Regions:
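Membrane-interfacial helix termini and adjacent extracytoplasmic/periplasmic loops
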Residues: 4-5, 9-13, 43, 48-49, ...
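Short hydrophobic faces within alpha-helices
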Residues: 16, 41, 58, 123-131, ...
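A structural signal for multi-pass alpha-helical bundles of membrane permease subunits
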Residues: 18, 67-86, 156-161, 173, ...
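Cytoplasmic-entry segments and transmembrane alpha-helices of multi-pass inner-membrane transporters
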Residues: 33-71, 125
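C-terminal transmembrane helix and the adjacent membrane-cytosol boundary/short C-terminal tail
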Residues: 114-129, 135-142, 197-224
Length: 224
């Protein structure tokens, strides 16, 4: 009936809001962390740099189900430790989903930004220093604008992956934290209404547009 359809629409809109919220928060944090790590691993000179750099490629090659289960076990151990130490009972929710999404998105941002850093001419920063700029000024006025297309490309890729993620979210979601992919899966288990086809098509189109924009930014940044 009309009431059932209205209720279903309400659940759908809530799932969309949840997906956008998780996507935006995890993308912002992952982009900041990924950029800083890319700079540290490219410019830094510290022991274990190569090993650390290789470790950040693991989320790209490890299957989603392995990551999802591993993170769920990790959160469960943390929750048990907190309950024993402080007597506070923690449960999975937006926090666990966002942390899980940050965990795999950092790697993608790092790879994209690091690729941009590799093509950057170091003499530009040296020229800025020769003109009297300190390291901070040289970074913000020279390095950051050059890195910006790479950072934006990494952010768009991270947001797309977060928006579409089902497996990792499935293992780390809590009550009332249904994202759009989880909502679609829940509806598919009951029946396949026409709305599912429309939502799925829209998700595919949004993903293609975001990935296309990310690739375009990467291509443009490679030329400059």
């Amino acid at each position: 009936g009309t009431e059932a359809a209205r209720f279903q629409t309400g659940l759908l809109l809530n799932a969309v809001r949840n997906s956008v919220f998780v996507g935006v928060v995890s993308t912002l944090v992952a982009t900041a962390l990924g950029t800083m790590l890319a700079l540290a691993l490219t410019r830094g000179r510290f022991p274990g740099r190569q090993t650390l750099g290789a470790l950040f490629y693991l989320p790209v090659v490890i299957p989603d189900i392995t990551q999802g289960v591993s993170l769920a076990i990790f959160f469960n151990l943390v929750f048990e430790a907190v309950q024993r130490a402080l007597g506070v009972r923690l449960v999975p929710g937006f926090g666990t989903i966002i942390i899980a999404h940050i965990a795999f998105n950092v790697s993608y941002v790092l790879i994209v930004v690091r690729a941009r850093l590799a093509t950057m001419d170091p003499s530009l920063e040296e020229a800025a220093s020769d003109l009297g700029a300190n390291r901070f000024q040289a970074f913000w006025r020279v390095t950051f604008p050059i890195l910006m297309p790479g950072i934006l490309a990494g952010a768009l890729l991270a947001f797309t992956l977060s928006l579409d993620d089902f497996v990792i979210t499935f293992f780390n979601a809590g009550v009332g934290t249904t994202t759009l992919p989880l909502f679609v899966y829940g509806m598919l288990k009951q029946r396949v209404p026409p709305e599912i086809n429309a939502i799925s098509t829209l998700m595919i189109l949004v993903s293609i547009l975001l990935v296309g924009a990310s690739l375009l930014l990467q291509r443009r940044s490679a030329r400059t």
